[in-house]
From Swiss-Prot:
GO terms for biological process: latency-replication decision. Transmembrane segments: none annotated. Keywords: Latency-replication decision, Secreted, Signal. Residues 1-21 form the signal peptide. The record marks A35, G36 as: Cleavage. This is Protein AimP. It comes from Bacillus phage SPbeta. GO terms for cellular component: extracellular region. It comes from the Viruses.
């Protein structure tokens, strides 16, 4: 049971860091559009 809880905690930490990185990329995508790259790339 403890391993399952640890796995959930690790997945949760990875998920939140991925979401925050994704939002940072979306905020910076305006700069990429100026450089000719499509939004969300």
């Amino acid at each position: 049971m403890k391993k399952l809880i640890m796995a959930l905690v690790i997945l949760g930490a990875l998920g939140t860091s991925y979401i925050s990185a994704d939002s940072s990329i979306q905020q910076a995508s305006g700069d990429y559009e100026v450089a000719g790259m499509p939004r969300g790339a």
